[in-house]
A protein has these predicted regions:
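Pre-active-site segment of Zn-dependent metallo-hydrolases
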Residues: 1-22, 29-34, 111-125
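Conserved beta-strand hairpin/beta-sheet module of binuclear metal-dependent hydrolase folds
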Residues: 1-9, 90-108
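Active-site neighborhood of phospho(di)ester-bond hydrolases with catalytic His/Asp-centered motifs
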Residues: 13-25, 42-46, 104-109, 129-135, ...
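Active-site environment of divalent metal-dependent phosphoester hydrolases
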Residues: 22-27, 48-51, 70-73, 86-90, ...
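Metal-dependent catalytic neighborhoods of phosphoester/phosphodiester hydrolases
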Residues: 28-38, 53-54
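A short helix->loop->beta-strand "cap" motif at the edges of active sites that frequently abuts
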Residues: 37-40, 60-61, 174
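Metallo-beta-lactamase
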Residues: 43-101
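Cap/insert and terminal regions of metallo-dependent hydrolase folds
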Residues: 113-175
């Protein structure tokens, strides 16, 4: 998606920028390069340095890597990072908490029940806010030429239903 309208804002009051994974819809080099140098960029400490290296190459800035499943402090906010358990995805889930509020941001990750329990232990109960993706981040099935329009619509509906069922299962796991 285009992010050109972000450039119209003054972002100098940010305390930090967090990048969950290396997909370009989460890593906009033009936007990151426009930020003041004193705003740190935080990323998960993945086994691979791909994300770190990509940020350095695209922005000439060094991101700060945060270890996984350990508590970190960014300003006045505590955070902890989990990663998607799928071996093919390098994506992260960020959990933030203060003394009063908590947020679980699953970003593009699929989170397991055991991870949710661990996150709830970290924040001390149910989150005040759950951010979860309810739409697919790819163009399947619409860019696939082997499907006719009826098949594309059917596959698309199945995909949406699967996403919403997953979202509902996460919400039920929190209760």
């Amino acid at each position: 998606p285009t992010n050109h309208y972000y450039m119209e804002n003054d972002w100098s009051d940010l305390n930090a920028v967090i990048i969950s994974h290396e997909h370009m819809d989460h890593l906009d080099p033009e936007f990151l390069s426009s930020l003041p140098e004193d705003i740190p960029i935080y990323i998960p400490e993945y086994p691979s340095l791909n994300l770190y290296d990509k940020i350095k190459f695209l922005t000439n800035r060094e991101a700060k890597q945060l270890s996984l499943e350990k508590s970190h402090k960014i300003g006045d906010i505590n955070c902890q990072i989990w990663t998607e358990e799928s071996p093919i995805n390098q994506d992260s889930i960020w959990v933030f908490k203060t003394t009063e509020k908590s947020i679980i941001n699953t970003v593009d990750s699929k989170v397991t029940t055991s991870q949710l329990k661990s996150m709830m232990d970290y924040i001390g109960g149910e989150p005040n806010l759950l951010l979860i993706q309810c739409s697919g981040a790819n163009w399947f099935p619409f860019v696939y030429t082997q499907y006719d329009s009826v098949k594309k619509m059917k596959v698309s509906e199945q995909k949406k239903e699967a996403k919403l069922n997953y979202t509902w299962s996460v919400i039920e796991s929190l209760q």
